[in-house]
């Protein structure tokens, strides 16, 4: 994946970090889905879609140059993500409700997703406010190939997300509280779990 050849300015650095952060968030989501077998609910899938839209905005900035329409994609994706995360928070706000899925540092992932979407919007606001300041970080000497790799990882995660969503939901409506993949038999799921467990043990 080709990116614009330019010195690493503060604005470009924020775009690079934004794309990397979204990749990390998607990797964590897939870890809990594949390793801990916590399938995403429909609202969770919409939150992932919002993050992917925001990620495309960052990716387009790095590949085709800084554009207002790219930042618009980031903001729209972040707003969609934030709205969906807020909706899920409201669904589990009643006393005694343990929430959906695992907690991370005391907060559920949809709460972290809301925080992330707000931080992304703030980052874009900072970028737009200082976009006229072209301060180069030449001393950082960041290899552009590193962020080409991040771009390819992002596209791979999108493909994996699409495949897993089709397997989970099939051709119809996604289950509100999914516990299995509609397009996979029990034998297929057992085989995948065994393979993932074996790979995890071998890495350890």
Each language-model region and where it sits:
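Secretory/periplasmic and organellar redox-cofactor proteins
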Residues: 1-40, 51-57, 67-204
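Hydrophobic alpha-helical transmembrane segments
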Residues: 60-64
């Amino acid at each position: 994946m080709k990116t614009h050849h330019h010195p690493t300015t503060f604005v470009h650095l924020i775009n690079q970090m934004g794309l990397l952060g979204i990749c990390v968030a998607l990797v964590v989501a897939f870890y809990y889905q594949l390793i801990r077998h916590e399938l995403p609910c429909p609202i969770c899938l919409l939150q992932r879609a919002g993050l992917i839209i925001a990620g495309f905005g960052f990716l387009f900035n790095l590949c085709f140059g800084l554009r207002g329409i790219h930042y618009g994609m980031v903001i729209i994706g972040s707003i969609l993500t934030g709205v969906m995360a807020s909706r899920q928070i409201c669904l589990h706000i009643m006393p005694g409700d343990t929430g959906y899925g695992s907690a991370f540092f005391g907060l559920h992932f949809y709460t972290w997703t809301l925080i992330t979407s707000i931080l992304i919007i703030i980052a874009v606001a900072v970028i737009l406010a200082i976009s006229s300041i072209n301060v180069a970080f030449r001393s950082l000497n960041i290899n552009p190939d590193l962020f080409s790799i991040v771009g390819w990882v992002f596209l791979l995660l999108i493909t994996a997300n699409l495949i897993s969503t089709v397997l989970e939901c099939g051709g119809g409506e996604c289950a509100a509280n999914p516990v299995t993949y509609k397009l996979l038999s029990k034998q297929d799921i057992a085989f995948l779990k065994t393979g993932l467990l074996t790979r995890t043990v071998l890495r350890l």
